[in-house]
From Swiss-Prot:
Protein name, entry field: Nucleotide-binding protein Pnap_0906
Domain of life: Bacteria
Alphabetical list of PANTHER family matching this protein: RNASE ADAPTER PROTEIN RAPZ (PTHR30448:SF0)
Binding site for ATP: G8, M9, S10, G11, S12, G13, K14, S15
Keywords, sorted A to Z: ATP-binding, GTP-binding, Nucleotide-binding
Function: Displays ATPase and GTPase activities.
Binding-site positions, GTP: D57, V58, R59, S60
GO-annotated molecular function: ATP binding; GTP binding
Family of this protein: Belongs to the RapZ-like family.
Amino acid sequence: MEMILITGMSGSGKSVALHALEDAGYYCVDNLPPELLSSFVALKRPHNAPKLAIAMDVRSATSLPLVPEQLRELKAQGMAVQSLFLDANTDTLVRRFSETRRLHPLSRIDATDQHRALVDAIELERNLLGDMREQAHVIDTSMIRAAQLQGYVKSLLQNPSRQLTLVFESFAFKRGVPLDADYVFDVRMLPNPHYEADLRHQTGLDQPVADFLKAHSEVDDMFRHIEQFLSHWLQALVRDHRSYVTVAVGCTGGQHRSVYLVEALAAAFGKDWPTLKRHRELEAG
């Protein structure tokens, strides 16, 4: 029996992720009170529900501290448990709430008619969910569409052995560091294909760009140093019971250098480890 727990910021896409899991055959429950988690799982065991997906949000904030111990107990009983935390930057969340005209769950102050400003409600939610975020695999949805999020969540399910999965992500520093990054590597000092007229409108996925970068020894040096660093620490991450580790590689525009290195790293580590790739700026269009 396995279970995926979904938490995260309001407006970050938890419902989209839950729908993706439902499409993948999971028995899904939204907004389950944390104090009912263990009893709900016990209720489903006799009914042969092998895959459960449960979403919790900030409306259960007072009970969320109960969750880590319950998850440890479920793992001790032999259940495969994963925790996903969906996040997005504040500007994105403000825009999403403005577009949908929905009220943030923490907008109302207690039982009064007074309301918090939207930004204040979002920051309060971040503080309340901080511990849950620390214990989960974080997915930054700031720059991805609903269909892309569904596809990404489904791709996380492709590791039945529960071996540590490496997620390699390219990004542009000018658009911010991904919120879900465990390690960030800055490659802006490397030769930039952007300044080559015939390469400017291509990406790190294209062979001419790859050939240009391969011709510079410092690019290979950067690749080898990142590879050596990760290889040195992977077993320690396994001992720490990590399910996912996100390695973000950033350049100025997220089109050439970071994309090339993410492809190279995923190919190298993919020989021995489950790997996923994301090119944030390319996927954003």
